[in-house]
């Protein structure tokens, strides 16, 4: 559509039909074009038709969306907790803080376990990334990033490298060595580059590829060695806040969540969204696959956690209580999948019975909001990070 049209005629060549005629200067996208009266009318009509087409397409999309929800509702004949009525209730549940990791000078924003079940990497608003020995609480490596708010970090499957990023819009990979005095920053490799902050990153099943999520509304798959973009994933309508790779050796799908209230499942080979779920009422802060890979959980600012069954293509459970009014910032499953651990902005960690939908425990200890939470690879413990500058290992 035109910005504005002046009805002052001049004589010359029309920029559309190239005939010598009386012209009208027309400003389109701040650029002056000279059209004859016939072409100017055609352009105005085309603009109206374009608006009508967009409106009809939007209406058709909403209609199809409604029909899809109707078809889903026909299959929604039973709830998960009804199926689980005959399942035995969980016994007494006790977990305590076994280790407290202190060393960050500001809010802990992200953490990840090494496959060796012992080491932990964490990132913070203080601009530091620290590798910890969770048994001794000693710091093994520390990297100072060029920016604050290091919002994402991940351990490589081999345990020989870490990846991190944040407000620098980049994902950087640092190799780890046995020499603790070696300058890690000198070996830094910038792998991914987004147009907005990096919110999450995760290696695939090898050290050679990494997935990233960003505030620019996209996810991307990168080659670590060359830094080449292998695949980009477009579909979220706002910042992407989290992602999780499907738990299989040939994991070719991942799930992401964002500020558009959506959780989306992607095919890494085609770059296409294969499933989308939009039942949350606020930002989706965290997503985590069920151990079998057939479902995933999400945590949101709407103070609920939800379970989605990928085979049934729908939400099957909501984990919430009237007394919980603060958002869920991070979620993860126990190794068996029976428990769902969820960190909240009210400083607590709630433990949910996945099958029955009931809360089995509430863990206190942090003095500020719980920002990140991950279960160890062997399932014997989990680690939580908080805005109180500490990480806690629970078992």
UniProtKB/Swiss-Prot annotation:
GO cellular component: a single term: cell tip
Gene3D superfamilies registered for this protein in UniProt: YVTN repeat-like/Quinoprotein amine dehydrogenase (2.130.10.10)
GO molecular function, one term: protein-folding chaperone binding
Example GO biological process: dark adaptation
Presence of the UniProt keyword Repeat in the record: yes
The WD repeat ranges on this chain: 103-142, 145-184, 193-234, 236-278, 279-318, 320-362, 365-394
Alphabetized UniProt keyword annotations: Membrane, Repeat, Transducer, WD repeat
Disulphide-bridged cysteine pairs: none
Keyword Transport: no
Pfam families in UniProt: WD40_Gbeta
Localization terms from the record: Membrane
Tissue and organ expression note: Isoform 1 is only detected in retina. Isoform 2 is detected in brain (at protein level). Isoform 2 is detected in brain.
PANTHER family linked to this entry: GUANINE NUCLEOTIDE-BINDING PROTEIN BETA G PROTEIN BETA (PTHR19850)
Family: Belongs to the WD repeat G protein beta family.
Role of this protein: Enhances GTPase-activating protein (GAP) activity of regulator of G protein signaling (RGS) proteins, such as RGS7 and RGS9, hence involved in the termination of the signaling initiated by the G protein coupled receptors (GPCRs) by accelerating the GTP hydrolysis on the G-alpha subunits, thereby promoting their inactivation. Increases RGS7 GTPase-activating protein (GAP) activity, thereby regulating mood and cognition. Increases RGS9 GTPase-activating protein (GAP) activity, hence contributes to the deactivation of G protein signaling initiated by D(2) dopamine receptors.
Subunit structure: Component of a complex composed of RGS9 (isoform RGS9-1), GNB5 and RGS9BP; within this complex, the presence of GNB5 stabilizes both itself and RGS9 and increases RGS9 GTPase-activating protein (GAP) activity. Interacts with RGS7, forming the RGS7-GNB5 complex; within this complex, the presence of GNB5 increases RGS7 GTPase-activating protein (GAP) activity. Interacts with GPR158; promotes the GTPase activator activity of the RGS7-GNB5 complex in absence of glycine, in contrast GTPase activator activity of the RGS7-GNB5 complex is inhibited in presence of glycine. Interacts with RGS6.
Protein name (record): Guanine nucleotide-binding protein subunit beta-5
